[in-house]
Amino acid sequence: MIVLALDVYEGERAIKIAKSVKDYISMIKVNWPLILGSGVDIIRRLKEETGVEIIADLKLADIPNTNRLIARKVFGAGADYVIVHTFVGRDSVMAVKELGEIIMVVEMSHPGALEFINPLTDRFIEVANEIEPFGVIAPGTRPERIGYIRDRLKEGIKILAPGIGAQGGKAKDAVKAGADYIIVGRAIYNAPNPREAAKAIYDEIRGV
């Protein structure tokens, strides 16, 4: 249920945190800060140290060939899923899906998403239902939007909800609204005791 977003630069710090919370998480999400700070091999190292599936949150948004080149590298490094933007169109999304499992962005959790991304949600859901990714990104900061997306999304496609904790989203509200996974970063990795922070969130959503 919990995806740990490891948005840090230092590989050793990332591994230490991941190992301390692995009993309470389902996946680890690595983003550009960690990959740029520690190299793409951090994906393999995290998998070896924790046994947890890895999401490469690159939000790929380029032409098909460039998306394909990047995705080939991260899947080759051991990523189980790659996040891709939907707005670049079916051809760019499919270039990544041909190489492995994908997660498509249909809405984002930050305020700026209301300007350009979120007005196209219905179109993005249509594309997701056609392509059938592993999952889609929906905002944990707006549970009513999770419910809206869940009602229109094809059965079997998972919803992953970022924005839990530091951005103001509540874990239990997101799960009740229909999220299959909640994505939590700073509320865990910046906590004085990341393991206890992860356990508290785990206990909050267990049985919801």
Swiss-Prot record:
Q: Which SMART domains match?
A: OMPdecase (SM00934)
Q: Where does substrate bind?
A: 7, 29, 57-66, 109, 162-172, 185-186
What CDD domains does the database record attribute to this sequence?
Answer: OMP_decarboxylase_like
Record key words, sorted: Decarboxylase, Lyase, Pyrimidine biosynthesis
InterPro entries assigned to the protein according to its UniProt record, in alphabetical order: Aldolase_TIM, OMPdecase, OMPdecase_arc, OMPdecase_AS, OMPdeCOase_dom, RibuloseP-bd_barrel
- Family, as annotated: Belongs to the OMP decarboxylase family. Type 1 subfamily.
What does the record give as the function of this protein?
Catalyzes the decarboxylation of orotidine 5'-monophosphate (OMP) to uridine 5'-monophosphate (UMP).
Q: What is this protein called?
A: Orotidine 5'-phosphate decarboxylase
Record the organism: Pyrococcus horikoshii (strain ATCC 700860 / DSM 12428 / JCM 9974 / NBRC 100139 / OT-3)
